[in-house]
Amino acid sequence: MVEHVPFKLKSEFEPQGDQPQAIQKIVDGVNERKRHQTLLGATGTGKTFTMSNVIKEVGKPTLIIAHNKTLAGQLYSEFKEFFPENRVEYFVSYYDYYQPEAYVPSTDTFIEKDASINDEIDQLRHSATSSLFERDDVIIIASVSCIYGLGNPEEYKNLVVSVRVGMEMERSELLRKLVDVQYSRNDIDFQRGTFRVRGDVVEIFPASREEMCIRVEFFGDEIDRIREVNYLTGEVIREREHFTIFPASHFVTREEKMKVAIERIEKELEERLKELRDENKLLEAQRLEQRTNYDLEMMREMGFCSGIENYSVHLTLRPLGSTPYTLLDYFGDDWLVMIDESHVTLPQIRGMYNGDRARKQVLIDHGFRLPSALDNRPLKFEEFEEKTKQLVYVSATPGPYELEHTDEMVEQIIRPTGLLDPKIDVRPTENQIDDLLSEIQDRVDKDERVLVTTLTKKMSEDLTTYMKEAGIKVNYLHSEIKTLERIEIIRDLRMGTYDAIVGINLLREGIDIPEVSLVVILDADKEGFLRSDRSLIQTIGRAARNDKGEVIMYADKITDSMQYAIDETQRRREIQIAHNKEHGITPKTINKKIHDVISATVESDETNQQQQTELPKKMTKKERQKTIENIEKEMKKAAKDLDFEKATELRDMLFELKAEG
């Protein structure tokens, strides 16, 4: 039975500006069973806070889809803060590294599947699916990996092992049930998905938990006591009357179903081998027979094999070609989907199926997989549409799909800080570089920063060199720069190490810098992906965090995309100015803390940064050890909170300290 728990939003802020009307409109739309709604939220208007308020008012389990792991991690941290008493879960691909199996016919090269699974993310995925069967106050932040195949939710739910104090059950029966749901006995290396036995006591480490295991104590053939225990220290956390243990794998199957599945795989193998031999593809037939029989033997003996997901259509006893089960099937009948940055996320969802199919087809043609492997796939876009009943798209620049399916946009244009969309100035390209240099110099004199966006890598490099020769402190941001370096460059821009950053695509997350008062768009009239109306609006938004924000477009003609972006920005500005005038608000630049690589032991302003870099050299051995321990604690906490950027920064600091020790 799913427990009903209301959503409790914790925040020191109340909805402001046009947040209250946006929240009310979306809540009304959900209650009226509207299928599609779009929240058009300008940069910096607090879209996440609006989404949180909608979830609280509507009270439905909610899936929030982001277009990459970094964004999903940021959203997860924010929603955890907003809903500390509710189940906020994280569901992304559990691969730190993933090389899918592939075959290159031209060189006769088979690339074996190679993957590194992140155990913590696997635990979070199990936590997400089990939460959906236990409570209804669930928010799952997911990447596009939520449309990839998962086991049958009914089977997953029906195979739970339920233990209750006073229940008649022999110890051996519990052990058998645990093995049936993919738990393995390990009395020495006790970890997630295992159990250990000590006399009449069975300790089980659920796949969905991080540090807590369940201790079940027997008296004869009866369960005498159930306790939650810290698996490392043995400290008793609390007594339980009842506990539900969910399977250790999402691809779990009953023994009788496994027998039927194996028969189905054997039948398909027989048909496919005949087909290949008739076409005189003897090498492919031999390869397929050998690989499949090995997998079947593993399934008979272990109930599992490497790459078992490729047989998912048989394991779930579905017809060939049918829609796979995904995370979406684990939700009940009444739930909500929110798609963040929908103008990027929806095309990503749409494109997943074709890319996956092309790779698998080559494997099937050359005898590495059975044709049914095609059914272990992401959803087609039409299937995604069928499975989702109510959607809210969230974007500053909604795409064609959202515009086509939404009758009326819910606008959120007013920022709580009173900040306006920037002024836009279009200038001719003649003498643009000299004009640009004088504008940058003007900002440098006022201790402000500049972003310059170009169209090509070569132009970015040449411009950076030219600006350096002109005495401007500048750096070049491009796709080859690693995440950590990227964070450092942005931090250095904020701290004044650089006056300007030159780049090609400055739309990516993490470029919201309050110190930036000028955004320069070169070749604004060259139509294309980087100069489309949506890209221009997103780029213009980078100057909307500063009360002196301005955008200069260098162009010899005004394109349709430019005109749309200029008109839309002006429309928003007028609404924002009117609101500020009515409420007596003075726009104020956001004061955003600068997160530093060395923020663990000393506050990260410039003075402290200098102190910190000198600190390791002055420390005694004891002080250094203490500092290392503090940083290690903070690093583990950051990783646990999914603040991976901070964790990486702290890790590098540790290396530095240890090297100097």
Swiss-Prot record:
It comes from the Bacteria. GO terms for biological process: nucleotide-excision repair; SOS response. It is found in: Cytoplasm. PROSITE patterns: HELICASE_ATP_BIND_1, HELICASE_CTER, UVR. Residues 28-414 form the Helicase ATP-binding domain. InterPro entries: Helicase/UvrB_N (IPR006935), Helicase_ATP-bd (IPR014001), Helicase_C-like (IPR001650), P-loop_NTPase (IPR027417), UVR_dom (IPR001943), UVR_dom_sf (IPR036876), UvrB (IPR004807), UvrB_inter (IPR041471). ATP binds at residues 41-48. Residues 603-624 are annotated as: Disordered. Keywords: ATP-binding, Cytoplasm, DNA damage, DNA excision, DNA repair, Excision nuclease, Nucleotide-binding, SOS response. GO terms for cellular component: cytoplasm; excinuclease repair complex. Pfam families: Helicase_C, ResIII, UVR, UvrB, UvrB_inter. A motif (Beta-hairpin) lies at residues 94-117. Coiled coil: none annotated. GO terms for molecular function: ATP binding; ATP hydrolysis activity; DNA binding; excinuclease ABC activity. Residues 625-660 form the UVR domain. Residues 432-598 form the Helicase C-terminal domain. Its main location: cytoplasm. The beta-hairpin motif is involved in DNA binding. NCBIfam families: PRK05298.1 (NF003673), uvrb (TIGR00631). The UvrABC repair system catalyzes the recognition and processing of DNA lesions. A damage recognition complex composed of 2 UvrA and 2 UvrB subunits scans DNA for abnormalities. Upon binding of the UvrA(2)B(2) complex to a putative damaged site, the DNA wraps around one UvrB monomer. DNA wrap is dependent on ATP binding by UvrB and probably causes local melting of the DNA helix, facilitating insertion of UvrB beta-hairpin between the DNA strands. Then UvrB probes one DNA strand for the presence of a lesion. Forms a heterotetramer with UvrA during the search for lesions. Interacts with UvrC in an incision complex. Belongs to the UvrB family. This is UvrABC system protein B. The lineage of its organism: Bacteria, Bacillati, Bacillota, Bacilli, Bacillales. The gene is uvrB.
